């Protein structure tokens, strides 16, 4: 390409990141190519074939090549001469065939001539509608460009549409956009293109997957060859020929085909083309799935691709709730059905076996890398055989009972008859889609709306976001909170158990390694001992349910683990607790008859109709007998709607890992009569997986836990982590948990003896291994891989194994499925030790490793490019999960030049650099890297996390709506606004933590003179044991009973942020007037807050700028990365949210979602099930005061409105042993005292919060 064309290409190819919302499929291959390792030497940029280069003909392959040609209607490339990448002329025969060798000037002249002919100005045509009607058959279906040298045909038989190599307004070329979205992989060049009508395919094996194809230049001759990455490049298919395999380069670079292969349209052509946005591309591609002949004009028809109503923070009633969520569940169900039914595999090789239950089991390999869907045990598949001369056609449905690390699937068949066990080849497999889980979600929402007994009135209103008086469950607390069979609880765990037992609805936030499961088991134990009936324990995944069931069983409670029938054959660590196991091993008189019938059924495969009826009745009676005798029933959230529990009612429900479940999924166990619910999870880690992007954009990916947090229900945070080496927990604690995580393990406990691994800093078992290799698109087209990182992962694994670490201690994790599959194959091929050792190493995606841990973690980041960003590595929750899986040590491989552009990653890299753990070079001679970091970009909200929000143009100090759930997709700011890239999900936004998590709207007192919030004016929903309360005069709304409300002076001591360790400098300023409070429209939007605030809320030493300043003045210093400098943000409702910069050194941990410092409870009296409860005045401190509310209708004695005889009961500022600061000075005024704070003149006319009697 000449310099002029290069300039035009650069100008026309800038990605419109505002428009491109298809963020998951970011698959750029542009980037730094400075390979420091001999495995994959590469020039600085992808080489462009020079003059007189020829592409070898597939028909002229060497002896090692495939014999068969893969010609269809088009020829394979035979010979190519290219003038500096300007184009090529293909001969139809041997080298220099009929076309001969054409010069670059001829090609340029031809291209210029075509351009002049097609795009001449016509005076009355403004160019906007060019290509609207696709004048030629080969015009790009997106933009209408029809230059033969610039267009490519999708060669899938059902498609055969043409697309150009122009980006237009998207971040990738139109042809690559189409291939990815449609999941197509074959292309053919135009017959009038310089290369002729050519199907791109591998020279050696004929593979036509363009995402696998690259080219190699010969060492001596001016010839290039197309070769696929896997298997031909990886197995060195051309080792006996004169090819330099180290110079292999992919055909798709920076989301475009290489310009010497498919020209990029000129700037003039692109300006005259139809302008199409990424959103329009997404919509037309979706439409083509059902109507292949649809055009862009069809998108404008009413009812086409309407966005569903987004999830709300609050709902008027359960019917509105159902009307919002039901369409989203249907969208997800339809997408799941379409995806599963479209996934099929042909020509499988099957090996046969017989299971312990005498059923046939088929084993076959089902590669994960090529599939968007992940198989899990219990999935239904249909195995088919088309038949041959000897065997008839056959098919049978079965359940997946096992998945191996080598991607082998064990499928247990339902029927044993007619199975072709003497055949091993030529099988096909399809998914069998079942709607059970989606049907149960819809049913739960219906019950929630129509059945008043489905949940208590209080929980009903809390779930809908209505403001009701806080209540307290009347329970006798145990003398001690320790539980037999479990480890001794620490102070924050005891605090969580104590608080949960007395509240109708509770949230427990468990950061990594803090003992969520142990705490949950302790809560369940105490609930069961209260004698209020059986406790239902759920989680979204079977693994989480099994872990919790095992812990609860260890306490001595009788536990039944209810499995889906499709999973009864799946091996489980708690097999002895499962219902089907207990049915088989129950020793009763009826059992003997049931056992005989079961044995008969296993042997014969079926029973007579009378025996079958008798068998089912006996089995059903036995199951009911076992479940009724249990103290605790454990199942998945979806499993709670199992017919075997249809007549059960559960007053108390605990849902573990609730942040990984969708809201309708959480609702299933709640509508079984719940009166007390506990949600356990961590919204700072990854949430539920939603496959349908339209449903995810509307908010289905938001968990119930997150929504309740945004509504002001404060999670109780567990604060002592027992997993990570203290050096490993430092950054996650400071960046994701405000420095509040304390270490329950010492450095000595996390040092291993006899392990000789070359850590750069001996007492810090961590380092960032600098990699500058190129990222590439995976075979699926929807993921990435990085061959350089994969090669060095193998070197690291080998070094760990040689140093004495066993394979089961090592975990390799990566965000991308393409890299996961490549690492598995690479280690199997290239590992220098025994192959079996590498097979035992677990290689997994970051998302699938949530909740897991290993002694040593190797994290491969993959992304390495100049322009395309880092994809969903942007998500701070994914980084949090990745950094917190290791117990003893972690190694991160990545490209700092690319990762440092994102502020959070910049902080991580700075942290590693300051501790001398940023290294490069060979493993046996690591040295500190001097690589220069990029200036971090400003980060804003992302639709993947902020539901209803999106990128756009806003003014520098304009955050738009103060509603955290407001839909701002169409927002555009005033002239002079700053550009918002469609970017990472850790942007600052009202009502959201700067790292991307919802924050509670809770009052920070004292703030006299603020506006009260009004109670939700709705009818009550039946009594739940509450007592009417008289409103307190002079103190109304959300802050009632908690000191003064928002809006007045902020005492100096509450605004001061103290230095804690090396977290960073502090903010130290009083707010002297109400006018200095941040506005509800945008947190930290005032310049006065800017001395240490970075754009996304993360603070780095040395940065001095406005929160919304456009210019980053400096970067990095001796101060580690700190995200705790958030003093006094305002929530959308006008209530201040206090982020205290406190660290992990024993000081009080601040006010963000922290209730672990409850110092104690006052005595209470009363005869009701639920007692009212108020936070103390310093709302963030998490102290509760509880007073006895005595129903005045039953006691005529002299009582004040709160039923408290001794006002001093209200001031319980007990010091907590967890923290070094006593806090007795908070809330020293009794709530019913009419002090000066309560008599603000502007409050006298406000409506008080009405008592709630439902």
Swiss-Prot record:
Annotated stretches, region: C4: 202-232
Annotated region described as S/TQ motifs-rich, involved in the target transcript degradation steps of nonsense-mediated decay (NMD), given as residue ranges: 1-106, 1013-1254
MF term (GO), any: ATP hydrolysis activity
Biased composition (Basic and acidic residues): 61-73
Enzyme Commission number(s) from the entry: 3.6.4.12, 3.6.4.13
Consequence the record notes for mutating residue 852 to C: Abolishes NMD
Protein name, UniProt field: Regulator of nonsense transcripts 1 homolog
Source species of the chain: Arabidopsis thaliana
